[in-house]
Amino acid sequence: MMSSMRIKSRENPNLEISAFRGHFATRHSHNSHYLDITRMKHEYGMAADAAGILVQHYIYEKQIDTIVCMDGSEVIGTFLAGRLAKNDRFSVNSGRNVYVVTPEYDSNGQLIFRDNLTGMVSGKNVLLLISTVNSGKTARRAMECIEYYGGSLQGIAAVFSAIAKVDEVPVMSIFSPEDIPGYMTSLVPDCP
């Protein structure tokens, strides 16, 4: 069994991820660690705490109508929507409905929204919530999908991000490479 280290969030010590050191290849990048964020995505308390950190970047400045969830981030997305819509006289979204949706992959590997969800994206201010951002390719695909369906991207939120921006859009994350000793990521052709 591989050894892991637990990494606690600087903003909330109740939030933690497990990092396994090794050489891990994805379709888009090679990484020095595998980050297990399963508990944060599926455990009630951790998902709620994660949303509590991420909401601070958007609640007072950005109107969000829809949260597009990627990579199994729907539980966090639901708590995030609740925090955004909470009755707070300073919140831009106070008392508003916030949709939480997930695109699907079609038979060609393209991200799509089914007809019954397009109205929740078209003409809406959208926050992209993604579990991890390493190279930014999955985020770019989601951004293209949001744009195709007429949504207006307001930001990107992530549990972990190895990069600060995707195509000039800031990525607000709970964890970054600075939190994980020795973390490195590289594009496939640049792998050492």
PLM region spans:
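Glycine-/small-residue-rich active-site loops that bind phosphorylated ligands and cofactors
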Residues: 42, 72-73, 134, 163
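PRPP-dependent phosphoribosyltransferase catalytic core
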Residues: 2-7, 11, 141-192
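Short, well-ordered alpha-helices that flank and scaffold nucleotide-derived cofactor binding pockets
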Residues: 56, 82, 86, 144, ...
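Active-site-facing substrate-recognition patch
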Residues: 1-63
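Short, glycine/charge-rich flexible loops or terminal/linker lids adjacent to PRPP-binding catalytic cores
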Residues: 74-127, 134-137
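Hydrophobic Val/Ile/Leu positions in short beta-strands of Rossmann-like dinucleotide-binding domains
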Residues: 69, 128-129
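Conserved acidic residues
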Residues: 65, 124, 154
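Short glycine-rich phosphate-binding loop at a beta-alpha junction
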Residues: 62-73
